[in-house]
UniProtKB/Swiss-Prot annotation:
Induction: Poorly expressed in vitro in strain N40, expressed for a short time following mouse infection, then it disappears (at protein level). Its main location: membrane. It is a lipid-anchor. This is Outer surface protein C. Residues 1-18 form the signal peptide. It comes from Borreliella burgdorferi (Lyme disease spirochete). InterPro entries: Lipoprotein_OspC, OspC-like_sf. Disruption phenotype: No change in ability to colonize the tick gut, greatly decreased migration to the tick salivary gland during feeding, about 800-fold reduction in transmission to mice. No longer binds host I.scapularis Salp15 protein (strain ATCC 53899 / 297).
Length: 212
C-alpha cells in the first residue's frame, strides 16, 4: 500500500472521529432507538488497527531489505574486488571480510525480528522468521573455521550465503529458509493491513429493536 494512500485514509479517519465526537453543547448522545439500531465500524479502533498494521509492515520491510542485501552480496560480490575500470574484478578466495559483513547483517536481522510486535494473527509467521534467523546466524558462527579467515574460499562463501548454490552445508540452506520466511511474513502483514482498511467499508448492521 502506497504511503500517500495510507496517509489519506488516516486523515479521513481523523476527520470522521472528530465529527463524531463533537457536539453542539449539552448532552450530544442520541436517545433515538432508531439511531442505536444502526451500528457501523468503530472508527477509533479501526484507525489504531490500521496504524499498527502499517507500522508492522514497515518494520518487516526493513528486515526484508537486510535479507536482500545478503542475497545481493552472495550473487555479485563473492570472489570479487572493486576495480577502477570495470567496477568489479576477480579476487578469488579472499572472502573473509565479505562473510564478516554478512554475519553482522544476520545478527541485525535477528535483533530486528526479536523486536517485532507479536500480532496475534501473525504469531506463527513471526515465530518461523525468528527461528530461521537464529538458525542462519548460528550456522555462520559455527562455521568460523572456514568462514572466519581472510582467505575464505569462494566455494565456502557460496555454501554459506548463496541460496541457489549446489552445496548449502555452511549456511546457504538456512539463509534460503530465512529468505522465504521473511517473504511469507511480509505478505501476511500486507494482507492484515489490507483487511484492516477494508473494515472501513463494512456495511452498517441494523439491529432489531429490543422489546420493552
Amino acid at each position: 500500500m502506497k504511503k500517500n494512500t495510507l496517509s489519506a485514509i488516516l486523515m479521513t479517519l481523523f476527520l470522521f472521529i472528530s465529527c463524531n465526537n463533537s457536539g453542539k453543547g449539552g448532552d450530544s448522545a442520541s436517545t433515538n432507538p432508531a439511531d442505536e439500531s444502526a451500528k457501523g465500524p468503530n472508527l477509533t479502533e479501526i484507525s489504531k488497527k490500521i496504524t499498527d498494521s502499517n507500522a508492522f509492515v514497515l518494520a518487516v520491510k526493513e528486515v526484508e531489505t537486510l535479507v536482500l542485501s545478503i542475497d545481493e552480496l552472495a550473487k555479485k560480490a563473492i570472489g570479487q574486488k572493486i576495480d577502477n575500470n570495470n567496477g568489479l574484478a576477480a579476487l578469488n578466495n579472499q572472502n573473509g571480510s565479505l562473510l564478516a559483513g554478512a554475519y553482522a547483517i544476520s545478527t541485525l536481522i535477528t535483533e530486528k525480528l526479536s523486536k517485532l510486535k507479536n500480532l496475534e494473527e501473525l504469531k506463527t509467521e513471526i515465530a518461523k522468521a525468528k527461528k530461521c534467523s537464529e538458525e542462519f546466524t548460528n550456522k555462520l558462527k559455527s562455521g568460523h573455521a572456514d568462514l572466519g579467515k581472510q582467505d575464505a574460499t569462494d566455494d565456502h562463501a557460496k555454501a554459506a550465503i548463496l541460496k541457489t548454490h549446489a552445496t548449502t552445508d555452511k549456511g546457504a540452506k538456512e539463509f534460503k529458509d530465512l529468505f522465504e520466511s521473511v517473504e511469507g511474513l511480509l505478505k501476511a502483514a500486507q494482507v492484515a493491513l489490507t483487511n484492516s482498511v477494508k473494515e472501513l467499508t463494512s456495511p452498517v448492521v441494523a439491529e432489531s429493536p429490543k422489546k420493552p
